[in-house]
Amino acid sequence: MAIWQGASRRLSTGAKVWRAAKKHKREMGRPAAETQVSEVIKRKIVRCRGANLKVKLEKTNYANVFDQANNVCKKVAVTKVLDNKANKHYIRRNVMTKGAIIETEMGKAKVTSRPGQDGVVNAVLITE
């Protein structure tokens, strides 16, 4: 079944709202690309509205980590996801989203990019 992102047919009171127009293709959505920590790197290129392209990162084990103290950015391996505010079950499944805390070779880092939409994992090193 398709994911539809249009307005609901019900008001907050429960009253039914009669549709002024039919459902359009532009209102369709897609399942989220839940980027997982894996040895295999897997990307998916999706055509978006206006013939634009979106790179969805599905699996990876690397991240571009920026160290603010030394002002240097390195590509390092990701071992696991430590915390994810988006969903508590993402921690067990090792799913990375924006704001997730990941364990890397350099230490703990916070993801600043949107891997499911940008196609890359960028993170900032957390100093304690």
From Swiss-Prot:
InterPro entries: Ribosomal_eS8, Ribosomal_eS8_CS, Ribosomal_protein_eS8_arc, Ribosomal_Se8/biogenesis_NSA2. One of its GO terms (molecular function) is structural constituent of ribosome. GO terms for cellular component: ribonucleoprotein complex; ribosome. The keyword Ribonucleoprotein applies. CDD domains: Ribosomal_S8e. Keywords: Ribonucleoprotein, Ribosomal protein. Pfam families: Ribosomal_S8e (PF01201). GO terms for biological process: translation. The keyword Ribonucleoprotein applies. Belongs to the eukaryotic ribosomal protein eS8 family. Part of the 30S ribosomal subunit. This is Small ribosomal subunit protein eS8. The gene is rps8e.
